[in-house]
Amino acid sequence: MVNSKGEITDSDPGSNHLLLNGLPDKAGKNQDTEPENSLCSQYEEKVRPCIDLIDSLRALGVEQDLALPAIAVIGDQSSGKSSVLEALSGVALPRGSGIVTRCPLVLKLKKLLNEDEWRGKVSYQDFEMEISDPSEVEVEISKAQNVIAGEGQGISHELISLEVSSPHVPDLTLIDLPGITRVAVGNQPADIGRQTKQLIRKYILKQETINLVVVPCNVDIATTEALSMAQEVDPSGDRTIGILTKPDLVDRGTESKVVDVAQNLVCHLKKGYMIVKCRGQQDIQDQVTLTEALQKERDFFEDHPHFRVLLEEGRATVPCLADKLTSELITHICKTLPLLENQIKENHEKITEELKKYGSDVPEEEHEKMFFLIEKINAFNHDINSLIEGEEFVGEDESRLFTKIRNEFHKWSCVIEKKFQQGYKAIYKQIEKFENRYRGRELPGFVNYKTFEIIIKQQIKELEEPAVYMLHMVTDMVQAAFTDISEANFAEFFNLYRTTKSKIEDIKFELEKEAEKSIRLHFQMEQIVYCQDQVYQRALQRVREKVADEEKNKKINSMSSEEVSSVNISLSEIFEHLLAYRQEATNRISSHIPLIIQYFILQAYGQKLQKGMLQLLQDKDTYNWLLKERSDTSDKRKFLKERLSRLAQARRRLAKFPG
């Protein structure tokens, strides 16, 4: 029997020999103990470190960031789930009607090889309690559930951890989940069934979880909710183990069907099935100890005509189940460790980058706040300077601001060319009108300067509004870029961000107005038709040479009338002058307007904004106001730091793990 320290006493006939999991093996009590000690030593070296590693990561809270290898125990109500866990752990867990397990229970079993003392520990939230007697476990778990989930019948997703260290338990960690319920009873929430399934699915959905499905032998396995849920998340059965309970309640004549299920012939699972017989309610009333129940279980299978074969195949009894679960868990851990290490590394890098967005904590001391604000403003000004110099960092699929502005300037050149081309259509009508109505004593071919002046002024005037439109386009682009930099640097400081955004807006209106004034002034000056004599003469010469070359390639046809010849001669002459002047005007306008925009909207805008930001440092009384963080920023930074700390510790532990 088990004494107050959880030890198996000599009165138990099967206690002379223990399996690796610490449970009695009647068949092996005459074997030599020396090989066993050697095997136990190897087992301890390989098994315990693996389980301890995952348990330590779970204790760090790493499971909040990514899934850890685990065995989750699920079953319908009254499936015998609690009895299986009791048999494995050697301690009594809460029992009763309705939902008994109301919080996920992490059951950490640690086998002690060189100690006889039983030790237990319950921990949840910020509470931790050492337990010295196995009989206290049930009460403490019930207390923990009441604290977390309330006194009623509700459930909670919050974990309770129970650690049991004893020579008579296997090295194993299990997560016990609430039993599946269908109908709310008593003071249970009306949607208790949905809540329970949602909690169970949260665990069994993870690919890192081995699902341990507890099913009574005396029900149709195809109708059990637990197995159905496991099949939904693991249709191939790769990570599901079936546990058949209550074989003593099977109707006579149906034993062969149970054997077929246990031998994986009915509902196939790659990890197979195990069958166990745990303490029933009558055994508990008769005060049958867990150790005595294990011996009764073995006797049951040895003497049963149908189920004996399952014992011989290693598919029956709690000790065999413990060995299988430990073996499966270790294999699963070793298989997932490389992936887990990569996931932790990737998460660590991702959170490190995310934390950079939130910057450092605001200092408490006033003089430190000044340096902190200076550092923030200097970083902002550096980013603004990089932007106006065309040296800012951009992503792979992004373009620098100056590249976008240059594209607008290129469009401007195209607009100038298009406007001049469209203007030529009006020239024919202008000259024809002059020739037919207003030509006086002038001989054919003499250009009327006034006509030339009117045409060129009108063409240039039509470019004024497109130039102003381009100014507004570029201004909006620069303002948006400055605002993005402000958000990147000051997003967590609402007042500082709002102040900076206000400065960006005010300076924009001021300089955009000045730039527009300069552009309109330029177009007013362009209404004076002027070009340096030598510059114009060279331009006219180039045009005439080009026209002469084109004429050589054409056949000269005689005109039918003098009037047509007169118009042609006038057109040819005025076109040459228009093209010559247009070349010089185009050079001036296509370059000077972008220069005005660059000066006011990029250089002056950026410089004035940087000076305005530095002026914020002059008023020390506003430091606290400017550096007041958004309500959620500090919490988010703290949350990210905690995650980063967890993952950093996890990386160190994985690095030290011998593998």
UniProtKB/Swiss-Prot annotation:
Location, primary (coarse class): cytoplasm
Which segments constitute the Dynamin-type G domain? Answer: 65-338
* Chain spans, region G2 motif: 100-102
User: What is this entry's stated membrane topology?
Assistant: Peripheral membrane protein
What Pfam families does the record tag this protein with?
A: Dynamin_M, Dynamin_N, GED
Note down the stretches annotated as region G4 motif: 245-248
What's this protein's name?
Interferon-induced GTP-binding protein Mx1
